Amino acid sequence: MKHLTAMNELSLEDIHELIEEARELKKGKSDSVLSGKFAANLFFEPSTRTRFSFEVAEKKLGMNVLNLDGVSTSVQKGESLYDTVKTLESIGADVCVIRHSHDHYYDELIGHVGIPVINAGDGCGQHPTQSLLDLMTIHEEWGRFAGLTVSIHGDIKHSRVARSNAEVLTRLGAKVLFSGPDEWRDEDNPYGTYVSPDEAVAHSDVVMLLRIQHERHEKKAAERDYLETFGLSLKRAELLKKDAVIMHPAPVNRGVEIDSALVESGRSRIFKQMENGVYIRMAVLKRALLNGENKKRGDQAYVLFN
């Protein structure tokens, strides 16, 4: 049994193995090795891509799928997340995929539940499967990470994608640049260098845009003039290197962080990221449940990612 809660739990070997497995699955490798097992998807925040990507991945692997949201569970009656997951485990769930608004929600689960927990996003914390699909997309484009420059633009402070990606890209040998409004800088993130939007775009092999995380701000941020000041406008896109590509974890706010004309342009890999997400999540689910480590063992502690 192997949880996945944060990217720093994965070794470089783990990352390469997951990407390679996802690539084989994408080629059409038939795989229903998890047939008959139950996956519980528990989402306490809105989600389109991550939620349905996991569901498609689970069904491609032959799994039975239980979809829950915070409104339809007994959490609304005061039940703790821990008791909810223990309930799902007791009625037969083999793995639990969770998105939650609280950072590190999984701390109360790891070592106390007998099924794998896969983090589908925790507040401003981590989003490991998004990072993995981003890495897969970059590797498909370049065949490497070392020596690349990846710039991350926008709401760095509130973005779990920025936090997950900056750490792992640095570990893989890429250079990370940050760009965005001063008030959205993440001073606790040591993995990137802050530069101007123009400098970031001009020097990057991969330009990764982020949406404004309105739901994590105390008051709604102004979007007026954001595109021209900080986003990837058509004018700023003229600075892109010849082979540079555009990425975005989505949802995309067209005309805010990126000009609408660029979303489906020849440089964009945004929908390729979404496609790759299915296969990465298939690989993550297989890793969680196979290799003889999926036996439920009560409440004992587990060592992550042996």
Curated annotation (Swiss-Prot):
Which reaction is recorded as catalysed by this protein? carbamoyl phosphate + L-aspartate = N-carbamoyl-L-aspartate + phosphate + H(+)
Q: Can you tell me which residues bind L-aspartate?
A: K77, R160, R211
Q: What class of enzyme is it?
A: transferase
Pfam families for this protein? OTCace, OTCace_N
- Keywords linked to the UniProt accession: Pyrimidine biosynthesis, Transferase
Keyword check for Transferase, yes or no: yes
One GO biological-process annotation of the entry reads: 'de novo' pyrimidine nucleobase biosynthetic process
Biochemical pathway: Pyrimidine metabolism; UMP biosynthesis via de novo pathway; (S)-dihydroorotate from bicarbonate: step 2/3
Enzyme Commission number, as recorded = 2.1.3.2
An MF annotation (GO) of this entry: amino acid binding
The record, for SUPFAM superfamilies, names: Aspartate/ornithine carbamoyltransferase
Naming one, the record's GO cellular component terms include:
cytosol
Q: Does the keyword Transferase apply?
A: yes
Q: How would you summarize the oligomeric state and partners of this protein?
A: Heterododecamer (2C3:3R2) of six catalytic PyrB chains organized as two trimers (C3), and six regulatory PyrI chains organized as three dimers (R2).
What family name appears in the similarity comment?
Belongs to the aspartate/ornithine carbamoyltransferase superfamily. ATCase family.
Q: What does this protein do?
A: Catalyzes the condensation of carbamoyl phosphate and aspartate to form carbamoyl aspartate and inorganic phosphate, the committed step in the de novo pyrimidine nucleotide biosynthesis pathway.
- Give the protein's recorded name: Aspartate carbamoyltransferase catalytic subunit
Q: Which organism is it from?
A: Bacillus licheniformis (strain ATCC 14580 / DSM 13 / JCM 2505 / CCUG 7422 / NBRC 12200 / NCIMB 9375 / NCTC 10341 / NRRL NRS-1264 / Gibson 46)
Q: Supply the gene name.
A: pyrB
